[in-house]
Amino acid sequence: MYRAITMRVEPRSDQRRFLDESIRVHHYVYNAMITAVKLYFSYYGKLPSHNGLNRVCTQIWQNNPWMHRIYQNTMNQAAKRALDAFRSCNPGIKQVSRKKKDGNVAGALVLRSPRYKKLERSNTFGYISNKSFKVVDSVDNKGKNRRSLSLGKMKGSLRCYNQSTPIREEPKTVIISRKDLGTHCEYFATIQYE
């Protein structure tokens, strides 16, 4: 059974730029994945596999050098979210192809599409592999517990505010979210563990 703990994190200014850039790139990749699924479905008449969309994410990352500052494997979460959005909009469509008797795919199925996200509504990104992040628990000079979160390709570690709640097992994923409060933004990390 998966459990989750959410805690507020306090990034420095360079870390804040990294988190904002990661959210912006994930917004771009999510919208690109919606277009990729539409094109794949119009050509093959079925939804693509998750691994197929991950390969498209890799191609996007390789073709855009401005994305190389973020961790590439986190883009796979955007592909998974786009595929899940298509599956929730089209619950009757399986991943198998449905062609007409003459072999033509056109007109066999109608695909309902999720909406493209605006940048203002994109507020999360995630590390879906525990090899790309690390939760560090330590004790300071005064004997207090200190928890910090290190993310792949980000310099330094994020200070976590929820120090006392124990994480009993090995963390599996972490989702970073941003909440706009008008005058400033607050950042939260949700750590999922088994």
Task: Describe the predicted segments one by one.
Residues 1-194:
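Nucleic-acid substrate recognition interfaces
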